[in-house]
Amino acid sequence: DNNRNEWFTPEDLNDKRQLMLQVWYPSVENDSEKLPFLDHLKTRAKTIAQAGKFPSFFAMHLERIKTNSVLNSPVLSEGAPFPIVIISHGITGMRQLHTSLAERLASEGYAVFAMDHTYDANITVFPDGSIADYRSNIIGHPDSVSIRKKQIDTRVQDIQFVTRELERIQSGALRHPLNGYLDLNKI
């Protein structure tokens, strides 16, 4: 979102808010390779283990979790336009934690959009390999209430940004497999 400064990175006055978004939708069955539950697992293992308070080698077992998700699968146009669900994870969470829910909703005819709330997520890995670490541990901070309010306001703005991008996807202004397949009246 080039219109918002990133307040989690006060050391970089030019930093703009970035979001990582993952999408599930009704798709044509195919034999393409299924996506892993977590991308960049080696990068994520340490922070997942810290959040869960268990040894990091346990987190490496997450690679055994199988999904039904396929990258860029053709849209199943039957049932379109699709109602939309936007998933917002909890503090230290991440978009992939809701994969089974998102897959189920997509199998029922929904387009599901889940984001990492950057710096509130356990760790965000962007397509270029850059990382946004978790920066929301403010327990005991004297201004924790006002900081949490700012975080919630940021999350609301994240969702509003995604909603605006959905309009661009639907219209074709932003190229995406779901161009023309979204029901913007059912979010």
Language-model-detected regions and their locations in the chain:
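Short substrate-entry loop that stabilizes the transition state in hydrolases
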Residues: 67-125
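Extended hydrophobic secondary-structure segments that form protein cores and membrane-embedded regions
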Residues: 24, 85-87, 181, 186-187
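A structural signal for well-ordered alpha-helical segments within the folded catalytic domains
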Residues: 17-18, 96-99, 103, 153, ...
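Glycine-rich loops and low-complexity Gly/Arg-rich segments
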Residues: 19-22, 47-49, 110-113, 136-140
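Divalent metal-coordination and catalytic microenvironments
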Residues: 23, 105, 159, 187
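Domain-level recognition of soluble alpha/beta enzyme cores
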Residues: 1-85
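Residues at helix-coil transition
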Residues: 25, 107, 164-168
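Alpha/beta-hydrolase active-site loop
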Residues: 119-186
